[in-house]
A protein has these predicted regions:
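Enzyme catalytic cores with a strong preference for nitrogen-chemistry domains
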Residues: 1-181
């Protein structure tokens, strides 16, 4: 679940943009967003402190690299907007798969760009990805959904529909088995 999280230290901004990993009615772990965009419709750095700690989520015998939206867009540190690449940092934890929670707004051909970024990350790190994108609208922004499951080679294992809510159960152990094959 995406929501703001309080920054417990007095330095920096008061809040983090965060993903809450929930299980059995409890918060298991809070993951802070690292890359805070300040272009186009985004002005996140104005409100949020960037993440500086990188840890996977341990869940039912799997290590999950949980990332928030923009955190996957700095593939291989080649984006001059950022000096850190979250997946470079998380790679040392040897995650079984990447879970990216996004609220990426619709624009013409944006789904093609997202697919390229997802494929590039899977291929670069050899790790499968579950990319979950918001669907709906918020003021003047429209979110088109189109969530994706990709294997470690970047092949699309599943794509959920655009512009409608969808629910899909994904057996992540199957993704990991494909990765090991």
């Amino acid at each position: 679940v995406g929501a703001p999280a309080r920054n417990p230290v007095k330095e920096g901004k008061d809040l983090y943009n965060a993903a809450y990993f929930l299980y059995d009615g409890k918060i298991q772990q809070v993951i802070h967003k690292t890359l805070l965009p300040t272009y186009d419709v985004f002005d996140e750095y104005r409100y949020f402190e960037p993440n500086k700690e990188f840890k996977t989520v341990q869940f039912k015998g799997q290590k999950i690299a949980v990332t928030v939206c923009e955190d996957i867009w700095n593939v291989g540190n080649d984006n001059p907007l950022y000096t850190v690449c979250p997946l470079d940092e998380l790679r040392s934890e040897q995650p079984d798969f990447i879970l990216n929670l996004s609220a990426s707004p619709f624009s013409y051909k944006q789904h093609e760009e997202r697919t390229k970024v997802i494929q590039a990350n899977c291929q670069r790190y050899g790790i499968p990805m579950v990319y979950v994108n918001q669907v709906g609208a918020q003021t003047e922004l429209v979110f088109d959904g189109g969530s994706i499951v990709a294997d470690a080679q970047g092949n699309m294992a599943k794509r959920l529909p655009f512009f409608e809510e969808a629910f899909e159960i994904i057996d992540t152990k199957d993704l990991v088995k494909e990765n090991d094959a």
